[in-house]
Amino acid sequence: MISLTASRKYRHTRQELFEAIDSVQKLARIKRELENFRVARSETGLQIIDARFGFIVVRFDTRLRYATWPDRSTELKQIKGRMKQYLCTYTIREEGSECEVVIDLSIKLPYGPVGFLVSLLAKPLYAWRIGRELKLLDKITVK
């Protein structure tokens, strides 16, 4: 199982940060795993997408739910697929003149002990990826 948390403070407002990730199309600009996806359903605050996640050498077809709570948080969660669990939340907290974005990522792979060993090897890669997402979020946020 991969379970990671990373955070970063920004000099942007909560609204500016949320606008950068308020839809799955915008989130795909910073989350590279979402390069090839298809929106199956879209409404305010909820999008259902079909995606293919590449995990090292294995590809997982999955259906994801992208839920948003305006100016507070977003959640990308697997609702159907071969992975045992995929959950990524983005929480925006206001602290004085700065805002902090916290990313929580949780992935459980199938394949029993082999999946566990692969997840141990992949954990540093995913730590680097969510760090990169936080840096990209700063670049694409409109001031």
Question: Could you tell me what each predicted segment is?
Answer:
Residues Q78-W128:
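Beta-strand/loop substructures that line and gate deep hydrophobic ligand-binding cavities in soluble
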Residues Y10-H12, F53-V57, T68-P70, R82, ...:
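Beta-strand elements of well-folded, non-transmembrane domains
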Residues S3-L4, L34-N36, I48-D50, S73-E75, ...:
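Short structured motifs
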Residues A28, R38-G81, R132-K143:
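Glycine-rich portal/gate segments that line the openings of hydrophobic small-molecule binding cavities
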